[in-house]
């Protein structure tokens, strides 16, 4: 066998599983179709501006609560710097601007001021949910999915707070709406909570299971919202670093075309270039539709199972506007994340979330500008990219989103310096999320929790994680799913699993904001800082001018060095077909930044890697 385990899909869940398994000594490989890992969590650059491709509102790094990200980095013993936002976000709901404070009583007071007729009920609701959350989530940290929770720890936790657990479990097959009706009567407050569940799990309160909503309504006020210092390049980059430092392989720019079978069991993966890799075990971190509709030959799956997968209802497709505006367009007091609710009565295309993360992280763009990324639903039928209608529809969507942002930020259109749109076609092309449904199957009653794809499949050596599985969408949830998949495989192999231990060393450092370039790499040596800053200048071009083939992966080396993954960068350098310094001068002179007279110092970076001897 080539590997102990192959992970199909390099999003956060797949990277989490792979990094934890590599640390336990398993020979691990990750396959991803993109040149950078991370799936929806990562970056691209336009000029000197860094954009987050998607997931950038990150929960799960707090000191308590559902803090799966923090646990994983502590388990990996991998340092990461994070910025904690002052509040979760601000919701612009009709004429109300509601700040989501990182303090439940303070937020309840704020909400009561917006809905005075429901003030007593609001405080009672948040008191009840907070107590249950404390008993179920905070006092019994458990980083595993419900389908993988063992009987013994479940009973132990239940006996500690039986009433809270009984209440929590009673919400399993009830809607969030039924829970809210125990407390509220005002239709407007139901519309408000509709917006919260549509943001958290892409479902309305009538659709969303109460067991998830009850946690979400509290968790984000307790744990808070975070952003990786220096951009989301660092989150998947640090997980990749852990994989490669422990001997794992990253097979990037290659798509898994099929799961191979021997004697009726998965035995490996065929890549889109025809190469085949063998492994004792597989972990799949992708959509349920691609698994049963594309990767697994119908000969090896049941017709009923394929039909079940096909019936899974997707979340709505999304569009994303990436833009740069004059700094003065964004007024003082604006939050890094602002929800813009155009229609409080219904979920429609006027509902947009604006991410202005350059407010807290000034490394993303120049001093006189801001990055603004706007994400929202689209309900139109999108033509094929090859269609003549596609550019027209794309232009219409750009105009629509710019108009939404202009209402919240007068002068936005005039101050616009750059904009680019990702359509559902774009999203599917880069992430393989079917139809551009960014959150996979909708987490709604009837296909929620245990009625979704489980960690364990009908084959004892194929495990699953990601948005299609039990816990659904969200960065801390998919991270937990990756952790559960890793533990399921470790149990099978008789190896030590990952379990929370009190007193674990903390590897997550919170940094001051606004975060600046001077703060980058401040814990690294001067020599490391110099090459990391050079590497970070790389534009990560989709079609690099410096090295024109995938075998000469200068872009991949620079990306790794920028996050401190020197072992992975040196390994990639040694894998190049020449691996000598003579060719690097030509690469450096062809660097796109050379047009301004300052190409990335590729030779300097490689000399550093050569001198490390790692």
Q: Across the structure, where does each feature detected by a protein language model lie?
A:
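N-terminal glycine-rich phosphate/pyrophosphate-binding loop and immediately adjacent elements
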Residues: 1-141, 442-443
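Rossmann-like flavin
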Residues: 94-207
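Helix-loop-beta segment of a Rossmann-like dinucleotide-binding subdomain
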Residues: 154-167, 204-238
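A glycine-rich dinucleotide-binding beta-alpha-beta segment and adjacent secondary-structure elements
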Residues: 186, 190-203, 218, 411-471
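Helical element adjacent to the flavin cofactor pocket in flavoenzyme catalytic cores
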Residues: 216-266
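Mid-domain catalytic core of redox enzymes
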Residues: 227, 255-366, 456
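C-terminal segments that line or cap access tunnels to active or ligand-binding sites in enzymes
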Residues: 326-425
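Ferredoxin-type iron-sulfur electron-transfer modules and their immediate structural context
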Residues: 498-613
């Amino acid at each position: 066998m080539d590997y102990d385990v192959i992970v199909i899909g390099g999003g956060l869940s797949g990277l989490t599983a792979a990094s934890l398994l590599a640390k336990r000594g398993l020979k691990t490989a990750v396959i991803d179709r993109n040149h950078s890992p991370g799936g929806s969590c990562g970056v691209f650059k336009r000029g000197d501006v860094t954009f987050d491709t998607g997931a950038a509102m990150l929960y799960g790094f707090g000191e308590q609560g559902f803090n799966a990200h923090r646990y994983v980095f502590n388990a990996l013993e991998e340092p990461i710097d994070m910025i904690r936002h002052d509040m979760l976000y601000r919701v612009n709901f009709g004429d109300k601007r509601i700040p989501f404070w990182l303090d439940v009583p303070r937020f309840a007071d704020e909400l009561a001021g917006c809905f005075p007729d429901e003030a007593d009920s609001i405080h009672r609701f948040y008191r009840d949910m907070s107590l249950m959350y404390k008993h179920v989530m905070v006092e019994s940290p458990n980083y595993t999915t419900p389908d993988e929770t063992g009987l013994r720890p479940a009973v132990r936790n239940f006996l500690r707070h039986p009433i809270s657990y009984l209440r929590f479990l009673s919400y399993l097959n009830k809607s969030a709406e039924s829970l809210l009706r125990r407390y509220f009567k005002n239709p407007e407050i139901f519309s408000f909570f509709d917006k919260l569940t549509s943001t958290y799990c892409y479902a309305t309160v009538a659709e969303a299971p109460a067991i998830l909503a009850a946690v979400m309504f509290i968790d984000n006020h307790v744990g808070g919202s975070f952003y990786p210092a220096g951009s989301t390049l660092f989150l998947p980059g640090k997980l990749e670093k852990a994989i490669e430092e422990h001997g794992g392989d990253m097979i990037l720019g290659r798509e898994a075309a099929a799961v191979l079978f021997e004697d009726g069991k998965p035995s490996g993966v065929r890549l889109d270039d025809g190469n085949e890799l063998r492994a004792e075990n597989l972990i799949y971190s992708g959509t349920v539709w691609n698994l049963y509709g594309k990767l697994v030959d119908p000969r090896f799956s049941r017709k009923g199972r394929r039909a079940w997968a096909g019936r899974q209802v997707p979340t709505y497709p999304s569009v994303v506007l990436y833009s740069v505006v004059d700094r003065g367009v964004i007024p003082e007091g604006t939050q890094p994340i602002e929800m813009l609710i155009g229609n409080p009565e219904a979920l429609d295309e006027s509902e947009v979330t604006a991410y202005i993360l350059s407010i807290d992280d000034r490394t993303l763009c120049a001093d006189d500008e801001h990055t603004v990324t706007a994400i929202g639903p689209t309900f139109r039928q999108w033509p094929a990219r090859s269609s003549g209608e596609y550019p027209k529809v794309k232009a219409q969507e750009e105009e629509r989103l710019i108009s939404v942002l202009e209402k919240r930020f007068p002068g936005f259109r005039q101050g616009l310096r750059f904009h680019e749109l990702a359509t559902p076609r774009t999203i599917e092309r880069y992430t393989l999320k079917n139809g551009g449904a960014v959150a996979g199957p909708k987490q709604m009653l009837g296909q929620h929790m245990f009625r979704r794809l489980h960690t364990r499949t009908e084959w004892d050596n194929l495990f699953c994680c990601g948005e299609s599985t039990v816990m659904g969408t969200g960065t801390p949830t998919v991270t937990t799913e990756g952790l559960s998949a890793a533990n399921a495989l470790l149990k099978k192999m008789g190896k030590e699993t990952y379990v929370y231990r009190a007193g674990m060393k903390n590897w997550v450092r919170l940094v001051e904001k606004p975060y600046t370039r001077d703060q980058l790499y401040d814990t690294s040596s001067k020599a490391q800082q110099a090459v990391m800053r050079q590497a970070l200048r790389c534009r990560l071009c989709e079609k690099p001018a410096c090295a024109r083939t995938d075998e000469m992966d200068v872009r991949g080396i620079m990306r790794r060095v920028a996050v401190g993954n020197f072992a992975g960068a040196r390994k990639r350098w040694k894998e190049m077909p020449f691996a000598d310094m003579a060719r690097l001068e030509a690469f450096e002179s062809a660097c796109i930044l050379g047009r301004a007279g300052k190409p990335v110092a590729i030779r300097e970076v490689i000399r550093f890697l050569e001198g490390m001897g790692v």
